[in-house]
Each structure stands twice: as structure tokens, then as C-alpha cells.
Amino acid sequence: MIPYCYHTHTYRCGHAEGEDEEYVLEAIAAGVRKLGFSDHIMLPNFSQPNVRGDYKELEGYLSSINFLKEKYKEKIKIYLGFEAEYDETFESYYRSLLEQHKIEYLLLGQHFSFANGRIIDYFGHVHEKEQLIKYKNLVVKAMSTGLFSVLVHPDLYMSAYDKFDATAKMVAHEICKASLKYNVPLEINLGGIRRGIVKVGEEKRYLYPYKPFWKIVAKYGCRVVIGVDAHSPKNFTTNEYSIALSWIRELGLKHDQDIIINENRTKIDEKL
């Protein structure tokens, strides 16, 4: 049984399937008590087909999830949010969504960075130390803003980097320090487990989660959550959750099953 899921996508991103209500019904059937929708954020004046929905789809997304929140309030607690990459260009937009209570939370998923009109992809394309450092700098800066409730798949940078060298370890340590300093939990992502064991360099492993990274997390005692990263209603009834739980037990990770997903939004409200 999966008690909570705050990492759920919709068909609008172009690479997920199923209607919004199907996710709710399957989550209820799987025993989920708290469900957060967090589709890839729609950005104004920015198009990224098959990665995120166009900005014109924003209101439809908000309306649909708010409708389902009310319809199923006796059966499941539904939260409304987005998964977003950090970039200073979009910080005021993210803040306005939270301040205006259009959404309840943001997940930090640093799949990309944006520079001089170029998109730098961190999923499966990080091979140089400079890219690791850029990734680390972005996620640490993002956590410092107070906008994000969880850093999802924090070990994404290891999806193609084929050695856990001094630079990769330094990135892990700095992410953990920031997680503690800014009170941002780290997510063990089931999406990487669903992809199965693959060969990266000389290792056969998941692209993520990457166990050596999580051994460092355990030493720091950072709060940890599990993210289904649902891209299909069927993802709630597969066995990846039990694998993540076994890692938590094996490594002695601090599993926060009672996370208040929108606690950072409350902090933002208090500053107004």
C-alpha cells in the first residue's frame, strides 16, 4: 500500500497517459490517502513539446484538479502543485502561483537548465564535472528560495555520469547540507526503478536512485520521501514502492511519511 504520493503527472505534459480522474480512482484503490498532482509546470512564453504542456493549458489543469479535489474529498486528500526546474527567470512566476494560492506546492525537479536560449538536459546527458557543479549550484540555490517542498530525484545527475568520483560525492554532500539547512526533503524516485537495471559505464544499476548517493544521505539524516512519479494511473499498483522501502530500511534513511507538502507555501504567506 502506498500511503501518499505527491509526484503525479497528467497527459498535458505529452509523455504521460490517462485522464486526471483515472489517477484519483487508481490511487484510492491502491490505498493512497494523500495525492498530489504535480505536472511539469507550464511556462509563459516558453514551449517544450512532449516535456511540458503549453501555458494555455494552465487554467484547465488547475480547474480539473480543483474539481476532483472537491468531488473526492471524502475518500482522499488531493493537493495541487507542479514539478518545476529552477531558473531565476521564472522565480517571480513560481512565487506568484503560490502567493495567489493557485497552487499549493512546488516540487524541484532539475531536469534542465536554461542559458542564452539553450536548454541543457541533465537527464542522461551529464558527463562532465562542470555539468555536475552547475546542477549542484542550481538545486542549492533553488532550495534556498523557500519555494520548493521537495527535491525530487536529487541523484538525477548520476543518470549518465559513470563514476562516483570526488566531484560526484561533493555534489551529494552539498545537496544534503542544503536539504538540512533549508528543510527540504529528498525524494527516492520510483520512476528510475521502473526503468529497470541498466549499464552505466561499468556498473549495472538503476539510472536513479543511485545507492551510493543515498548512503551519504543516510549519514546526514536528511528527511526522505518516496515519489511514485506517476505517468500512468497504473503506476500506483506496481511493486517499486516496496523496493524503495527496502532501501530505506537497509540504509537507515529517515522516512518522513507525515510530510506537510505545502509547508513552504505557508512560510511564503507569512512573509506577505
Q: Whereabouts are the PLM-identified features?
A:
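Short, surface-exposed amphipathic charged segments that create phosphate/polyanion-binding patches used
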Residues: 96-97, 120-122, 270-272
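An N-terminally biased module of ancient metal coordination in phosphate/nucleic-acid-related enzymes
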Residues: 1-88, 92-93, 98-100, 162-170, ...
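Charged catalytic cores and adjacent phosphate/nucleic-acid-binding surfaces used
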Residues: 1-10, 20-25, 158-159, 163-272
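Short glycine-enriched, charge-decorated loop/helix-capping segments at active-site entrances
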Residues: 50-54, 121-127, 202-204
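Divalent metal-binding pocket/active-site signature
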Residues: 17, 43-44, 107-195, 207
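Short, contiguous clusters of charged residues that form electrostatic/catalytic patches at enzyme active sites
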Residues: 60-63, 133, 137, 212
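Short beta-strand and adjacent tight-turn residues that come in two discontinuous sequence segments
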Residues: 37, 108, 227
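Short, well-ordered coil/turn segments that N-cap beta-strands
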Residues: 1-2, 31-34, 74-80, 101-104, ...
